[in-house]
C-alpha cells in the first residue's frame, strides 16, 4: 500500500507558547456517534479494512518521523528520515550535532530551519524526562495519560502524540487526525466549521466506540485520510463519486 501523506499544523517558532489543552469532551450526540459509525462502515469496503500498518518504528523514531512530516509530502519526509538514520548512529548523536548540519540533512522537508532545532529540542526533552531515549514505558500507561506525557513537551501536539502511540510498535488505541481526515469530518458535519485540527482529536475520538482496538482506530484514521486525498479534495471534491454523498450535507451544496 502506498504510504499516504500525514499533515499537521506547521511548527511554532522556538519559544512560542503551545496552545492550551482542549477541555475533556462530553459524550457526543447519539446522531453524531451513529453517523461516525456509518461513515466507517461505508468507507471500510472502499479502502480495504483492516489496513496494514505502513511501518513499524520504535516510538522515538516515530516521533522524529512525525515531526519531519508536518506539512511535507510523505516521500520527502521519508527521504529526510532515512538521511538522518544514515548520518547519525543514534538519536543521541543527532541531539549533539550542529544545527546547520541537521538542517542540511533534512533540507528536502518544509521549514528545515525550524524542524532541525525543534527535533533536537524534543529529543533532548524526552531524554531528560524519561532518563533516556526510550519511550517504551508509554505502553504501560493509559492512552490519554501517554498522550499528555508527550504533549507536555513543547513542539509535540495532538497529531504527533497520537501518531507516536498508534503508528509505532506500541500500537496503542489513539486516533490521529490530519488535515485530510479533518476536512472530511468537517464536511460531514462531525465537527463544527470553526474546530481546528488539534481540538478535533478528542471530539472525533469520543464519537467512536470506547472499546475500539488500535487497529479499529487506525483504520478509521486511514480511511478518512485516504478519502480526503482521493475523493474529498480540498478544491473541487468529487461528490458525484462519493459513497458518503447521501449522508453528507456538503454534497447537497455542491
Predicted segments — roles?
Residues 28-254:
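Catalytic cores of DNA base-excision repair glycosylases
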Residues 1-27:
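Polybasic, lysine-enriched low-complexity intrinsically disordered terminal tails
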Amino acid at each position: 500500500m502506498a504510504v499516504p501523506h500525514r499533515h499537521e499544523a506547521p511548527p511554532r517558532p522556538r519559544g512560542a507558547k503551545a496552545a492550551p489543552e482542549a477541555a475533556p469532551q462530553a459524550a457526543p450526540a447519539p446522531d453524531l456517534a451513529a453517523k461516525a459509525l456509518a461513515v466507517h462502515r461505508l468507507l471500510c469496503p472502499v479502502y480495504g479494512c483492516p489496513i496494514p500498518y505502513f511501518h513499524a518504528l520504535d516510538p522515538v523514531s516515530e516521533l522524529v518521523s512525525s515531526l519531519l512530516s508536518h506539512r511535507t509530502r510523505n516521500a520527502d519526509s521519508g527521504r529526510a528520515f532515512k538521511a538522518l538514520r544514515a548520518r547519525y548512529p543514534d538519536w543521541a548523536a543527532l541531539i549533539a550535532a550542529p544545527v546547520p548540519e541537521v538542517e542540511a540533512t533534512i533540507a528536502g522537508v518544509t521549514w528545515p530551519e525550524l524542524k532541525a532545532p525543534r527535533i533536537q529540542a524534543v529529543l533532548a526533552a524526552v531524554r531528560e524526562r524519561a532518563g533516556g531515549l526510550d519511550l517504551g514505558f508509554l505502553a504501560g500507561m493509559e492512552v490519554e495519560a501517554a498522550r499528555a506525557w508527550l504533549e507536555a513537551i513543547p513542539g509535540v501536539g495532538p497529531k504527533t502524540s497520537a501518531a507516536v502511540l498508534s503508528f509505532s510498535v506500541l500500537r496503542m488505541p489513539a486516533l490521529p487526525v490530519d488535515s485530510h481526515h479533518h476536512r472530511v469530518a468537517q464536511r460531514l458535519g462531525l465537527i463544527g466549521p470553526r474546530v481546528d485540527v488539534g481540538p478535533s482529536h478528542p471530539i472525533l475520538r469520543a464519537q467512536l466506540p470506547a472499546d475500539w482496538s488500535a487497529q479499529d482506530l487506525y483504520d478509521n484514521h486511514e480511511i478518512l485520510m485516504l478519502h480526503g486525498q482521493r475523493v474529498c479534495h480540498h478544491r473541487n471534491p468529487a461528490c458525484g463519486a462519493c459513497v458518503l454523498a447521501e449522508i453528507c450535507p456538503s454534497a447537497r451544496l455542491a
